[in-house]
From Swiss-Prot:
Residues reported to bind Mg(2+) 1: S122, E189
Gene3D superfamilies on file: Mur ligase, C-terminal domain, Mur-like, catalytic domain
Cofactor note: A monovalent cation.
UniProt binding sites for ATP: G98, K99, G100, S101, R342, D357
Broad EC category: ligase
Organism: Caenorhabditis elegans
Stated name of the protein: Putative folylpolyglutamate synthase
GO MF, any single term: metal ion binding
Residues the record lists as binding Mg(2+) 2: H217
Family, as annotated: Belongs to the folylpolyglutamate synthase family.
Amino acid sequence: MRLLPQTNRILLPTTSSTACGANQLRMSSEKAVPCYEESVRLLNGLQSNAATIKKLRVQRENLQAINLPQCRKYLESLNISAEDLNALNIIHVSGTKGKGSACAFVESILRSQGLRTGFYSSPHLVHVRERIQVDGQPVSEQMFAEEFFHVYDIIKREHSDNMPAYFKFLTLLAFRIFVKLNVQVMILEVGIGGEYDCTNVVEKPKVCGVTTLDYDHMSILGNKLSEIAWHKAGIFKESVPAFYSPTTTEAEEVLIARAISKHVPLFQTPPVSAYQFARDISPGIRGAHQFSNVSMALQLVRAWAEKCGFPLPGVPLSTDTSGFNVPLWMCDAIESCRWPGRSQIVSTDRNVTYLLDGAHTPKSMEACSEWAAEEIVNLKKENVKKILLFQCTADRCPSTLIKYLKPLGISQIVSCPTQLHSSIDKSADSANLNASRDEQAEKANQCVQAWKESLDQPESVTEDQMKVFDCISSAYKFIESQAASQEILVLVTGSLHLVGGVLNLAGKGK
């Protein structure tokens, strides 16, 4: 693999605001600087609207089949070869829940050893730049805008009648940036599924992982765990080691069958108790469920290092996939890992404590409830008013998720569409055009009704306990207004877009 001396690395521009008007360039005394806001506006124009998404779900098989060939054509236009991608020493991770957290742990561990890391994830919470990180930080507005227009102009010129959709474009942009910066390892999180996901254009990753499987995106991936597992295992590549988190028998059988057909060495990650840690650890991402992701990260890191011949101090390179001695530096990296919006606590000076978690599947919501219950005790908030700020999106069913929150003693639910403000700014990072306003409003009403029906005495619930607003900022203001007379604890969950909006409004979205 390529290990670049620090002095030869390309320096990233410092983060700076590049606000401008309709023109995509802002003139400075030295040169024209591409406008970040204009790049975001054009990017948002690539989002699929609600009608298109419905069509995609109906025609999913035909459209999935052409997804990867299209990606290869775009990459060819950008002069990015399969060899260029292979040289990024990619760690490719799919799964339903925990894949982002596992990737974050991997990135933190490898970065702690001086490697230049590239991390591509989704979705973003506040700023779209969060999806493309180098050395643990989002790329600057300047770099994002410069590289955006490089990619956009080429693809617009050569594929004007067939522009890539939002996620696909960002994937191309991430590849472009990481190849240009010559990162030493790319941690690549799958978008949806795996088999037909545009990240699967990578031919030779160093190692693959499949985190916990659950029911999500069922209109695309299928209604059975075995069907979902088939898609997730689509990232397996011949002779490339792959790991999977413990799962059901039916899903495991599919993972094993796909591994055999692709000649893939496949291993189940061991429980965290199989490792010998140099000291007691508290992972930087809270929650007992994160230990499964820690185990996945440890296996991915060691397998990657073995494949690349990169020494990990205190960790013998080995093809053994059992637990191993975890040295102090690795414990530190696990604890220093940060992944906002997942099991996060935000306390304000306005008598409000927010528990935020982007859980949006049954298993993740159950884990969220267990984490929240533990934190309520730790924070000594058992006797304060508890509000649930909840919304779920796409084809997710509120009643299958919200029932897990019943033990928390919530006395009021607030729901809203995942738009930050009532009017949509198409140049804003938070703009979400994938669902119509009416659909989101209807889903918000379904959420509050599902909460009511989950209670033992739903007939006693008053209208004041069930509030629906037109946007996140209105819901946030309503919640904050109640803090004038009492202490409040708010659980924000169901959607990462919702969590990101609250972090933005609370001033924690930087």
